[in-house]
Amino acid sequence: MSDYVDGRDSGGTGMSAGSLVHTLYIGSPDGNSFGSADRTAVVEMLSSCFAGFTINDAEGFFEGRPVATLIVKIATGDTPAVEEVTRSIGRKLGQRKVGLELKGLYQSISMD
């Protein structure tokens, strides 16, 4: 078992203690592939809040229908900032809800 000192593993693995990973599930406005304008808007909104993140294209399902989905991974301890940008993205795309997963728990973030 290793102890972390100053954010580094004193056991010699060179790994940091890490950050929470937040995962967003963002469906496309019309269910089809994301248009370049919508994708650019998502990237710009995320970039204005976080130095780094990862986006994967996926096919999700909502109410039994396939929906082009962006899965976004953000490593940060600032959950309120993630929730705020999630709502901003959802409103920009005209979504009712955007999915947020944290610590293995999924919740739908409402735009209300």
Which residues fall in each region the model found?
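Positively charged, small/polar-rich N-terminal and surface patches that mediate targeting and assembly
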Residues: 2-112
